[in-house]
Amino acid sequence: MVNALPEVKRAVAEAQPAGADAAQLKSGTLGEGANMPIKVGQVEALFRYPVKSMGGERLEMAELGWHGLDGDRRLALRRLDNRGGFPWLTAGKLPELIRFTPRRKGEAAGSSLPTHVRTPEGEELPVFSQELAADLGRRSGSPVEMMHLNRGIFDEASISVITSATVDEIGRLAAERPDVRRFRPNILLSSLRSLPFEEDDWVGGALWFGDTDDAAAIGVTNRDERCSMVNLDPDSARPSAEVLKSIVRVRDNRAGVYGTVTRRGRLAVGQAVFFEPAAER
């Protein structure tokens, strides 16, 4: 990607010219057609999932590297008796897995990788222990082992984004309390336009996080095709089929977008987010 930060900075400087229409500022349309990135919103929340399919962490700040957020999905449970192309134990096979919570203890408190996992019953077991593997093997019905992969274990892409407007709309359609945790994104955006499924319009373009010279960026590659995990209540693991049905019904089973990292940097809650259409890059 061509470094678009000069354009981003100009967009920020010119975003509020004298006499600018307030509706344009609110909608984010100011600057369209002016060959510059457009401010689309800000980072509302950041999430990291140290162990694939287990509970996530809500962060105020995170480092974005070539393989996603630092520490995201670097650990996963491998099913030892599986010879297929996808050997990982996920909440699709064991819904209760989302109620397991990775934790850090002692000197590892500042590390991106967990040292322990808290079970739904409150027991804390070392992340690479035989005790944890035996517990999860018993629950899933097949032996498992914890694996550490430096580049992460992703189903589709290393970074995922969804807007709060999309989460709220799906909750309304499914008659369920909106809960972003069902969608397991890395980045939750609060968009200026507050339009559900606005993310679809970003495919093929780029998102920039902040307006500094070291701003991080991702290329938006495709819409996020959803699976039954969105049906699981993050606290109880109880399913509600209406969530996935609603996404299938109104959006061809897609909600949110995937991306690939094109510029490393730091992400932070409250950070301004700019969209750069493909034609302008």
What kind of region is each of these model predictions?
Residues 1-35:
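N-terminal amphipathic/basic-hydrophobic helices that include classical n-h-c signal peptides
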Residues 25-281:
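Metal-cofactor-dependent catalytic cores
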